[in-house]
Amino acid sequence: MAKSETVRNAERLVEVMMKGNDASHDAAHAFRVRDLALSLAHEEALGLSSSPISLEIVELAALLHDIGDYKYLKNPSEEKIVEDFLVKEGIDIDKSSKILDIIKQMGFKEEINGASNGSQSHTLEFGVVQDADRLDAIGAIGIARCFTFGGSRNRVLHDPNIHPRLDLSKHQYMNKDEQTTVNHFHEKLLKLKDLMKTKAGKRRAEKRHKFMEEFLTEFYEEWTGKA
């Protein structure tokens, strides 16, 4: 199916706004999440059970989800870039509201300590977009992204004396300076499999989760000189 002009404009906005980010949160990440979200949507029969509007909501939310990410925010005004873009593109208020709600509520920090994702957690559009973003955070690509982000922040690779933080608060999670790169697996990435919202997301997460577990086993053996 041919891309709409709005989708092409969204892609261009993503390329411009994420150009200065490290490779863990660059335009390629947004495009992978979009492709995953649409794939999950089709697997969940979203395009068959709902109108094409649902797929447009999924695609735009997935593409635009990391614009204005707090980790890369240079100016508070950037938080309104997506909203302004949707207005400029003539997206109706109902559709725009759904897209913005998905983006606002899909982050891991919003779900820490059992916090609710609100009404959006019950929509399939929300589920496939959030699952797609989380799938890109685990598995082989997730491992690569984790170490890329850690390196960009000069984070310690691993320190056996620094243990993963249990029962993280939202504030603690957002304080990236307190993490080591390997501990991020235990504090977030290994939890994502059980937080998937869709059946399709759960199925795909199993393989990626297993790959991370195998990687960490090998990592610890090499770190301690056993391998």
Spans of features found by a protein language model:
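Generic N-terminal amphipathic, Lys/Arg-enriched alpha-helix
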Residues: 9-20
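His-Asp-centered metal-binding catalytic motifs of divalent-metal-dependent phosphohydrolases/nucleases
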Residues: 53-73, 78, 82, 100-110
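Divalent metal-dependent phosphate-bond-processing catalytic cores, especially two-metal-ion Mg2+/Mn2+ enzymes
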Residues: 2, 18-27, 31, 35-50, ...
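Acidic/histidine metal-binding catalytic segments
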Residues: 45-60, 90-105, 140
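N-terminal glycine-rich anion-binding loops that anchor highly charged ligand groups
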Residues: 2-11, 53-56
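An active-site-proximal "capping" alpha-helix that borders the catalytic cofactor pocket
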Residues: 33, 77-89
